[in-house]
Amino acid sequence: MVNQAFMLWCYITPVLGAVVAEQYIGRVKTIIFSSSVYLCGLVTLFLSSLPTAYAMGISLPGLLVSLFLIGIGTGGIKTNVSSLIAEQYTGPKESRRILKSGEEVIVDRDLTIQRIFTTFFLYINIGSFSPLLITIIEKEYGFSAAFSLSAITFSIGFIIVLVSRHLYISRDPDSSIIFNACKAFWIAIKHKGNLDYARPSYQTEQAATRRLSWDDSFIDDLRRAIASCKIFILYPIYWAAYSQFLTNFISQAATMETHGVPNDIMTNIDPITVLILLPVLDRIVFPFLRRQGVPVRHVDRITIGMPDFQPFVQESYQICQRTCFQIISAIELGLGLQAGRLTQCCQPAASEIRLLYYPPTTKNLFDEGLKKRAWPHTDLGIITLLFQDMVGGLEVEDRAAGKPRSFIPVKRVSPNEMIVNTSDSLQRWTNNVIRAGLHQVTAPDAAKLSNGVDMLPARCSSVFFFKAGRDTSVGPLPEFVTEDRPAAFEDMTALQYQQLKTRILHGVEG
């Protein structure tokens, strides 16, 4: 019971350690403080194991106090050491290096960090072999000798960290990810579970006085973290079996013939297995998977979400395609055309779907009109379906303004809305009866009005371009050409028009 309670305590305190490090004192100070508490726990454990303490009847209280202190120290160390290690590597995303053999290789940041943590995990499991020595010392010399070795070894490591603390790269405390996640979840709960409402860009549009301590990319990371949590469904089964190493396996071994081997050695089955598998995975399995085009890099690789991505996109493509044909049929009805007149021009379709990511950027260039995420343009194709996040920034031409290139922002009403924009081919077919929608992507409207915003958040969108086949004519249809309305466009194929527009955009003659 004491052992199970101690394990539970050691998995509760990391939550507190993360909050203290991220919001108050930083990782290095948290690790140093937690290490000092951990060391106090080890010293208390050693003192409580002495014969004098046993004679005074304080061994059990001393044990409980030491476990309490060790648990606190574990919380501050376990949750911050891995993050601190990741912060130490500041190399570029990719760099080139010449080996001694003369071979030029590319150093990938993600793979480098993966190798760092593989090595770190390897050393952890090498350290896990200490019970081999500790159990022998405990059997030959008693608990006090075994506990003293732990305290001495930890003291050496603590001194090294303390002396070199100024050498570590550590992010300054800002706001707790845990608190921010809880706040974001609460906002999502109030909006039927939709995390898009927790984006600062959406909150700013709704209430300019409200300030959130995270950016839009935090919500994206939170979504990925939730997806990765699928694996935790299996954890109760795993831990139910794993905890037997520390309880039943040891008790069972104590009732068996050990031939001089301490029964406590059962806990080393786990690190032995890890030490065998880690080099195999790192040097053989993972490189083989990367050569086969199956990279194993990020935490979301432990979930089974990515294999479903391609079928999801294919299904989305088919749904968008059907939707576009329905919209074109409605346009036929609205223009009084014969059923199928426009839809037959859309076949065969050569549509495409794009996933667009606009990275975070500084706001000042947008304010000065020197930069836009997408300059004013019309789309190739017939119509465009746009699905965007809550960041905003899309603007369309205001034709009622009476002056050219006057734009108005497209306000988001629902996170699930679809925006339909008319494109060049439809304008050419209808001989300017339906004009292509001129649009641009710039700073969100709320950011323009706020002087306290220095950075524009990342923006993501999915765009479906409904396009006719490359050999389809995009000249004006006879139904739209009259004596009063002569053909405004030359008859040409969709491919020829795309080539013409490309030459115009790039200033190429001919």
Swiss-Prot record:
Residues that span the membrane, as ranges: 1-21, 31-51, 57-77, 116-136, 143-163, 231-251, 269-289
GO molecular function: dioxygenase activity; metal ion binding; transmembrane transporter activity
Fe2OG dioxygenase domain segment(s): 348-468
Major localization class: membrane
PROSITE patterns registered for this protein in UniProt: FE2OG_OXY, PTR2_2
Residues the record lists as binding 2-oxoglutarate: R459
Subcellular location: Membrane
Expression triggers: Expression is down-regulated by ralstonins, lipopeptides produced by the plant pathogenic bacteria Ralstonia solanacearum. Expression is positively regulated by the imizoquins cluster-specific transcription regulator imqK.
CC per GO annotation: membrane
Residues bearing carbohydrate: N80, N421
Keyword Transferase: no
Family annotation (InterPro entries): IPNS-like_FE2OG_OXY, IPNS-like_sf, MFS_trans_sf, Oxoglu/Fe-dep_dioxygenase_dom, POT_fam, PTR2_symporter_CS
Entry binding sites for Fe cation: H377, D379, H439
Alphabetically ordered keywords of this record: Dioxygenase, Glycoprotein, Iron, Membrane, Metal-binding, Oxidoreductase, Transmembrane, Transmembrane helix
Membrane topology according to the record: Multi-pass membrane protein
One Pfam assignment: PTR2
BP terms from Gene Ontology: oligopeptide transport
Family stated for the protein in its record: Belongs to the major facilitator superfamily. Proton-dependent oligopeptide transporter (POT/PTR) (TC 2.A.17) family.
Known function: Peptide transporter; part of the gene cluster that mediates the biosynthesis of imizoquins A to D, tripeptide-derived alkaloids that serve a protective role against oxidative stress that are essential for normal germination.
Protein name: Peptide transporter imqJ
UniProt source species: Aspergillus flavus (strain ATCC 200026 / FGSC A1120 / IAM 13836 / NRRL 3357 / JCM 12722 / SRRC 167)
Lineage: Eukaryota, Fungi, Dikarya, Ascomycota, Pezizomycotina
Gene, per the UniProt record: imqJ
